[in-house]
């Protein structure tokens, strides 16, 4: 997989000459445009001579008025404007020659301060020099009283120190002159007098001038002094000195400051940059069209705030030149220099200043840095996400008559979206001579335009998108179908994937334009192809609500119905009998098996007749002829199960019906199983067709069933009052125990809650029995079929609401005894409001949290793409069932973890027979065989052990869950992994929302915060578990005042070595005396600190721990996520190493680099016979990992923009554009999917789809 564009983007410091070479002229005046003529002022910030003409090929003075492209490249002799296109005003830069050097604020203030590190100053000292508070010694000359780079602070509190420094130096000069009458002696004596008395001010300039005269010492202040010092740095020499110092102090001392300095020195040397370039002598002026002035209605103007910042610089620069010419006192000049420095700082990064420059509305002006960073910055707003043409949005409504690959687009919207294509069609078919005529036809609503529209919409699908787009199914393609009205019509089955409902949701429509885009939309994104959800490989298009209800009603059986016992010889005969009202839909009838499709039955079965209903005949007609006949709720073995409904013709049908037990109708669960089996057997295309038939049948019969719900359907439940009386008595008893001091407050609360929970459970059980007796009760039908609601809702309607949560989310002791049917009392209503409100507040907060989690996950994993077939990895990953060791229950069974993965080696049973050969994809069948053989641990190929330098291979990834086939090369599995973990994150959060705050339903505090804790690699203080550092046996547990000391003994070469672990107060122990422990084993309850685990037990232990813990959180919420997605994120978290010894490589001790970069350096060192570096594994949270990415563009667009860019500039980093984000920013095709493998195959698939649809 080669990167097709082979370009790199490099960022580095610009020298003054470089900036001048970019420039097209110097800006010397602060004016922008003339208020009368509204034309650009000469030499100002919008000058046409510098930046190019405002109108194409027209000059400023009016000599060249007519825009004539023939004049391109000429210059107007009168006004000097080059005649060219006005677009150059977006790219031509100017410059300002600064009267005095200024430092770049990033180099001074972004921590760690780069200039301070280079000059070995404290950043505070550096700032004092730059902002004209303190002087600095540039060269001590022959004076022994000063050191180079010493800062002379004149702040009131610190001037004492400076006075005592200057005193001896001046005394020395008096001795040197040795002439009491000399002018300088008199001057020196006056100075000494001022220095000795702290209340008298003294002139430091005078003092330093005198010292310089006699000792050749040099002093400086401001950026020019810093520039002077930076020029003095000899990189090679400094690198050598720093390395020697590092060697001298040894590896264990605190050497972080030296290492930082060495890093900067080496970076500058490697990237051929001079330190003094960090100080600006020339300031670039960005092109005027990027900082425009815009005229508003009413003749007023508004301008980009950057212009204000530039004006301020130019004004101060001019003033400084004037002051210098006039020969003003140094204090005035220094003040002007300081103001220029601050003006430049404000332009570059206003928010970093202690007192930012403010606009009229008292908020800081937006500087160049703030234009880059944040959600509204250039990176995220304009480079990673753009607004697109040919798009529209509207409210969605249900489209029950659509096919699964269609969407209804309102006619007016379609006309606007497809306007260019309509115009083209009208011209081609000679209804319009030119574009103008065609546009006029559209304006006048000519009937021909609708014919044109009908034709052109067949050429291209549209993309529908619903925000928030949490996973790849949030954007799908559909063939447009014109509909009346203004709402977009959406197929009811795709709503789950979009997480849409029809209560006012809006969706956006986009039209793909190019041939390739159209082909991709058709071949890869069509709604009818998205049958499976990528996160778990389960069908995502499961029917809901009305469709379930209709199918339930159609497959319902009842004895004693009209036409029961009628025998039919043909399917059509039975259906006609139903249509004419001879037989009811749910009556049990007989039909000759021979009349039904032959493939559905065995030879033997076809000799008898089948007991069924007309509804079931209609239901089975939606399936393919080779799909088994479904007559009951056993789907997996439908072919055998149907035997119990087939009778020999010798048996009388009425007799058979009398002995026959009614079977339950088809419910939601069965429909899901049918879809799964159907998909595996027939693929996406046929499944979509079947689903459309299922939908039509469902809607038809849910309408015919006339199911409604009213207060009359909800039976009153009188028994509850007896239970209440009994419970009240128990509670009174508990309270009296508490009053007598036999129970603590906590115990009392616990027991009361238990009593009321039991009551509610009991009422719920009894209600279930009551409900089941009336199988036609609409509430029962809805709950039983899975269409809507459940028994808990029903309990609340007629039984009791039960216990509620309080504002903190704890359970209250007072239950709500009323049901909704009776109505709640005022106090009960009040108690129930807490939970419901908390649910709403949680939802709002956690949705944002979850969205941010997804964003960070995408950033950490975006560069992972499937790049080849097999990496030939020499290591596998051993897995077993995920077991919650605390409660000893299975969270993820082994089968779920191995299906769809490749085996690493032969998997054999006890006898040595091979069940699955090496490198074979394990299907469901093989997985069952492995489990049947009693195997509990399996070594599989995993992303975690994949050997590819970049990306992963097909074998290590395994099956693509969204297509149920092997993953294709080019699949961006990193992003899919991030979406699959992030998308249910919102469900983790929304769970509290649906229960209306009913107690007992766990509020998800362990959910999202726990995931964040694991992936950010943080642990909450106080909840950290103690882990064993070495293997051994727990030889003793000593308890002293609630604090345990666990003693672990290990045997090393025959000697017993003890290690003691002190626990927190009242910590819960996880081990007993005599237990064997392995490194990393938990000794106390709590969450493990991942850094410690990595240190003690190595990477595999960390990988397994994160996998298990993340799975635990999701599975407890009933959400299934495939292991491989979590593995990808974990792979990225463990992808970095920290250099411990740099050997003879250019890597520095303490530097964090990616494993692939480290491997490259080691290989290179070995090849050249140098000592290779040594490093240890690092685990980085998903917040930190992207910032350490190989690509600086990707890191800068994630977070900490200024810091990432400053670092990249000093290192002169190159971005090889290997990830997805970098290429999106530059408008390239991403190196994934068709951008990697080419589009030919996709074009062919799309062509075939198109033929079949129209």
UniProtKB/Swiss-Prot annotation:
GO molecular function, one term: DNA binding
InterPro entries: DNA-dir_RpoC_beta_prime, DNA-dir_RpoC_beta_prime_bact, RNA_pol_asu, RNA_pol_N, RNA_pol_Rpb1_1, RNA_pol_Rpb1_3, RNA_pol_Rpb1_3_sf, RNA_pol_Rpb1_4
Binding residues for Mg(2+): 501, 503, 505
Catalyzed reaction equations: RNA(n) + a ribonucleoside 5'-triphosphate = RNA(n+1) + diphosphate
Record has Metal-binding as a keyword: yes
A Pfam family this chain is assigned to: RNA_pol_Rpb1_2
Superkingdom of the organism of origin: Bacteria
Note describing how the cofactor binds: Binds 1 Mg(2+) ion per subunit.
Entry's Gene Ontology BP terms: DNA-templated transcription
UniProt keyword terms in alphabetical order: DNA-directed RNA polymerase, Magnesium, Metal-binding, Nucleotidyltransferase, Transcription, Transferase, Zinc
Residues that, per the record, bind Zn(2+) 1: 59, 61, 76, 79
Any one Gene Ontology cellular component term annotated for this protein: DNA-directed RNA polymerase complex
Similarity comment: Belongs to the RNA polymerase beta' chain family.
Name of the protein this chain belongs to: DNA-directed RNA polymerase subunit beta'
Gene: rpoC
